[in-house]
Amino acid sequence: MILGVGSFAHSIGKALADAGADVSTYLTRNYGHFPPSLAGETFHRDAFPSPVPLIRERKIDVVIPQSIDWALAPWAADLLKSGVGIFSPTGEAMRIERERDFARELCAKFRIPFPKSFVASNRIEAERILAKNPQPFVIKNPLCSPTSPVHTILCETVADTRAWLRHVNYAEGVFLQEYLGRAEAGHIALVSGGEIYSLVTNQEYKYAFNGNQGIVAGAPLGGLVERDENDKYGLARGLLHPLLPWLRKVNYHGPIQVTAIKSNSSVGRASSRAGLEKSNARGGSRGRSPHQKWHVIEYNIRIGVTSGPMILRMLKNPADVILRTTRNEKLKLEFNEELNFGCSLTLAGYGYPFTQVRGPQLPLEVDGKFDCDVWWNEVAQGADGNLVATGHRIADVIALASKLDAAIAMAYANIRKIRVVGSYFRTDVGQSLWPPGTV
């Protein structure tokens, strides 16, 4: 049973159903209800205040949460007591994503590079920190949640930071993380039986528009994955494996993703020279110093809406892998040959990424048949049977292939078959930020 909505529930559910699993979805939000129904039965939270009776009645083996907020639901304790497998770490293990400063402390303990960071409870404290550390900061909420009062604000100069500190919501304080440039990448693994099993190295295109311009959107506009069970780029060795003592101590079993930036830690530090600040604002030069190393930006404990569906398609037995992970058993990962790379593209709707701007429900047209995965998100079916776009994120189009260029080309060929007035997609995924460590 998936706990979620939209393209996450549609994609994860369909990938597992195709692998032979009996899939259902408990709808946890008030939108995106139609797409999961294409993968299996759905249950609305208004009709079923808790999923636990459904889990018992239907003899569910595994639940897969879309968000870490399931742990704050009134039924969370009952879910844990039910004995069902949960494809997520629980308890103390969740803190590595939930609490940003806890992740920083873990990295300090295990000597993992992490940007200089501070927590401030109000504007006065935040401005005092900036005065003592005159450098650009990325502004985040101290607690990670889809409903956080502050979503990531990437400031590339001291002046940017100062301006935003006057404007943000301090309801939960702010987490100020040193800006280290744009050479970002991620690595996703499973932790089970006290071991780390690498899956893919990934890239997310988080900026709203081509050329990595505009604001950091609420969710990525595109993504790439490369099958990487041997940790080709060293992200797991440097940033995940040192955590093994803690992972074992807290009985961590489930997905883990690290997002990191390659930097020598001088990028983004204070300087009186305007030239350095101008270079920082552009994300630094494309050539990377041989002395640069990966720095953790954050950890996530979910398989993710961008990379998750591609990972499940790459695995030969995804349902079995998930089940064994929830049981904390040793894993033997088998991949489908020739599916070495994946590309995900998002079709964004009217007004996105500025979610305050909303349009009407709009007709959705498809010209021809798809030959890759298309996962509907904020889409519904009208009384006439035709599809309509109902929100800001319409679909995720995902293609896999043996070569990266082939996966990208297939994804673009298919996303161009969808038409919704006012919609758009990035046309440059793969042209920057890849290979990992470049901008």
Task: For each feature predicted by the language model, list its residue ranges.
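A conserved helix-loop-beta module that forms one wall/lid of the active-site cleft
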Residues: F87-T152
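Phosphate-binding core of ATP-grasp and ATP-grasp-like enzymes
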Residues: V168-G173, L180-R227, A236-S266, H291-V296, ...
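Active-site "cap" helix and flanking loop/linker of ATP-utilizing ligase/carboxylase catalytic domains
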Residues: A236-I256, N264, N300-D371, G382
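ATP-binding N-terminal substructure of ATP-dependent carboxylate-amine bond-forming enzymes
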Residues: M1-G91, I124
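Short, low-complexity intrinsically disordered segments enriched in A/P/G/S/L with frequent Arg
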Residues: R273-A274, N280, G284-H291
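Generic C-terminus detector
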Residues: A383, A389-V439
